[in-house]
């Protein structure tokens, strides 16, 4: 049952889980010193689904509504706060948003769009690189993995984390290329090669940095993880329909719908301070898959409204027109509303299914596949309702 009146113990519990953002390192250590020390996985909440707060300053409320402003606020939650996920409920969200879902936790309600559903599935790590391989792909299967940095700091995302005194982490659903294993610190660690030695992962914005993370937080991907779904179906019969009004994506084999999910496509809005329109709308029309890559650094410079970004390890990318891709998104849970810079955001689980089902097939060894017209992969019908 939801505890609507918090005891002192409950209050200290929820207050304490928000301390990880600004107090992530011992006070005696500088940010650079903290980056260099090995890090174990923390003890995660004991819950089948664990909600991770994706944004700073999110309210924990006593009721599933923001009506009344802050009248029902219990606590201000920091980014990466972890909460036991009891159930989703239909709430009352004021402010023009279509998503009305809140997540009920033992301590209160959190707006669902800013709470990533994660799981804690630790793995038995391997201690040697697979024979004959230069490395391996690995998927994060815990809420997050704290990272140890090796070498020079170069990437905008890491510099941003340090400027805000926030720990660099990999999050549930991200996929990375590992090229080394060590046990010298008393536990197994994998080294994430952010550039991936030219394997394709580092295209477009990677900075060639190296990070270590505890191996138990990563599932080593196998051929089964990328095996084709419905391999006996004629590839021409596989198509996708993207509904820009309803923010949904459907996969078809002939006329039969075989998969459906909510997505977040490109956003179109007006800047409050200038009245300038910013249009990242995903285009309608017939779009053709021309590039698939297991994981990619996605980076854009400063644009209108100061909306540049640098996001490493974006998983399961299916490019369907220029730089527009269907891919996994771990930084929000606002699926069903426009949100992106033009790409089609899906949950990591949905993006992985689409990646495996769509054409062309991508093996672990290759890591990516490209097509040039007249050749192309799966066709996507992007349209309004």
Q: What are the roles of these predicted feature ranges?
A:
Residues 1-10, 17-20, 25, 32-34:
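N-terminal secretory signal peptides
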Residues 75-78, 247, 349-356:
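Solvent-exposed, polar/charged alpha-helical surfaces in well-ordered, non-transmembrane soluble domains
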Residues 76-117, 168-216:
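SH3/SH3-like beta-barrel superfamily modules
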Residues 233-235, 270-271, 280-284, 291, ...:
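Exported/periplasmic cell-wall-interacting domains
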């Amino acid at each position: 049952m939801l505890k609507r009146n918090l005891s002192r113990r409950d209050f200290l519990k929820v207050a304490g889980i928000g301390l990880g953002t600004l107090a992530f390192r011992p006070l005696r250590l500088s940010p650079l010193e903290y980056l260099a020390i090995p890090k174990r996985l923390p003890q995660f909440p004991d819950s089948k689904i664990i909600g991770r707060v994706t944004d700073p300053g999110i309210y924990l409320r006593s009721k599933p509504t923001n009506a009344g402003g802050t009248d029902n606020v219990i606590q201000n939650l920091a980014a990466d706060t972890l909460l036991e996920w009891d159930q989703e409920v239909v709430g009352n969200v004021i402010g023009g948003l279509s998503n009305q879902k809140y997540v009920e936790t033992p301590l209160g309600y959190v707006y669902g769009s800013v709470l990533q559903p994660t799981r804690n599935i630790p793995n038995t790590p391997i201690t040697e690189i697979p024979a004959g391989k230069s490395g391996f792909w690995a998927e994060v299967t815990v809420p997050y993995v704290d990272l140890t940095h090796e070498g020079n700091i170069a990437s905008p995302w890491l510099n941003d984390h340090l400027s805000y005194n926030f720990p660099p982490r990999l999050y549930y659903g991200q996929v990375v290329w590992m090229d080394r294993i060590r046990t010298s610190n008393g536990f197994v660690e994998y080294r994430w090669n952010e550039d991936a030695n030219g394997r394709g992962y580092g295209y477009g914005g990677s900075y060639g940095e190296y990070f270590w993370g505890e191996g138990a937080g990563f599932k080593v991907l196998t051929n089964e993880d990328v095996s084709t779904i419905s391999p006996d179906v004629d590839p021409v019969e596989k198509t996708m329909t993207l509904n820009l009004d309803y923010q949904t994506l459907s996969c078809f084999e002939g006329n039969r719908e075989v998969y459906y999910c909510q997505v977040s496509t490109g956003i179109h809005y007006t800047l409050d301070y200038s009245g300038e329109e910013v249009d990242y709308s995903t285009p309608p029309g017939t779009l053709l898959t021309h590039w698939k890559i297991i994981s990619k650094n996605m980076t854009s410079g400063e644009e209108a409204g100061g909306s540049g970004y640098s996001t490493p390890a974006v998983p399961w990318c299916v490019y369907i027109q220029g730089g527009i891709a269907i891919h996994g998104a771990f930084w929000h849970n606002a699926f069903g509303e426009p949100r992106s810079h033009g790409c089609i955001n899906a949950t990591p689980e949905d993006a992985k299914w689409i990646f495996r089902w769509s054409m062309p097939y991508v093996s672990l060894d290759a890591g990516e596949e490209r097509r040039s017209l007249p050749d192309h992969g799966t066709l996507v019908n992007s349209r309004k309702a």
